[in-house]
């Protein structure tokens, strides 16, 4: 059976200050130039009073935390290649503003050895400790070809 090298409760954290450049680069890559993200004048008139980062950018930061967990497992030597099956129950609970410092916590919450999957609880907090985004992430630990274990 494929070794997953993760255990219930294993956790990693990733932190970043979300800047204007991050948001504009994300808008450029995705084509999402919504006024919510790039139009300062428009957003000053809104309830928020300022531009907000894309929710999907927060999912990108969740992916960074997932990669950190995978890298930790790879360092132990694997006979599988972990791949993302996706995110469930993604919710954006509060806005993330330019200049906010976010902290993503990625914690293994379930292991299904028969299906070679792990599930993680993912939480994103801002610098004030407010929960701004949540999700569940599913990893599939795909067995390598015999004799071709991951480095």
Give each language-model segment a name.
Residues 1-53, 127, 143:
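Catalytic strand-loop segment that frames the active site of acyl-thioester-processing enzymes
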Residues 52-60:
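Short, conserved micro-motifs enriched in small and acidic residues
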Residues 31-32, 43, 71-72, 77-79, ...:
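Short, charged/polar low-complexity linear motifs in solvent-exposed/disordered segments
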Residues 50, 63-103:
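Hydrophobic beta-strand-centered segment that forms part of the acyl-chain substrate-binding groove
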Residues 1-11, 92-151:
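HotDog/MaoC-like acyl-thioester-processing domains
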Residues 26, 33, 61-62, 70-71:
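Terminal targeting signals and extreme-terminal segments of soluble enzymes
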């Amino acid at each position: 059976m494929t070794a997953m090298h993760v255990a219930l409760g294993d956790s990693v954290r990733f932190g970043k200050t979300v800047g204007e450049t991050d948001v504009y680069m994300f808008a450029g890559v995705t084509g999402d130039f919504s006024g919510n993200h790039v139009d300062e004048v428009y957003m000053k008139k809104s309830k928020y009073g300022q531009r907000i980062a894309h929710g999907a950018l927060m999912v990108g930061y969740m992916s960074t935390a997932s990669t950190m967990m995978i890298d930790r497992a790879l360092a132990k030597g694997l006979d599988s290649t972990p791949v993302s099956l996706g995110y469930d129950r993604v919710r954006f609970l509060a806005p993330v503003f330019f200049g906010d410092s976010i902290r993503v916590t990625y914690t293994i919450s379930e292991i299904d050895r028969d299906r070679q999957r792990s599930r993680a609880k993912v939480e994103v907090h801002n610098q004030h400790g407010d929960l701004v985004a949540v999700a569940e992430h599913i990893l599939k630990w795909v067995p390598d070809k015999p004799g071709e274990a991951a480095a």
